[in-house]
Each structure stands twice: as structure tokens, then as C-alpha cells.
């Protein structure tokens, strides 16, 4: 039997998909802007 592929880890989640990471690059800021435009309640992990 193989293990489940999703092994939750809050620290890794934030480091890979977090707000500060998104703000770091121009493309990341564009993602946040698009999500704000769309009216998302949560912008990032």
C-alpha cells in the first residue's frame, strides 16, 4: 500500500503558498490583485 500524498504541514503551506511569498514577486502580487478583484475572502494560505 502506498501512503497518502497529502501530508498536511502548516509551516510548509505558508512558506510555499503564503501571503509574504506572494508579495515578494511581481507575479505573486498580480495573483493577489486578481483575487482581490474577484472578491476572494482569503487571498492566500
Swiss-Prot record:
Q: Has keyword Zinc?
A: no
GO BP term, pick one: translation
Q: Which domain of life is it from?
A: Bacteria
Example of a GO MF term:
structural constituent of ribosome
Keywords per UniProt: Ribonucleoprotein, Ribosomal protein
Q: Does the keyword RNA-binding apply?
A: no
Taken from the UniProt entry, a GO cellular component term is: ribosome
Q: Which residues cross the membrane?
A: none
Similarity-based family: Belongs to the bacterial ribosomal protein bL34 family.
Kindly provide the name given to this protein in its UniProt entry. Large ribosomal subunit protein bL34
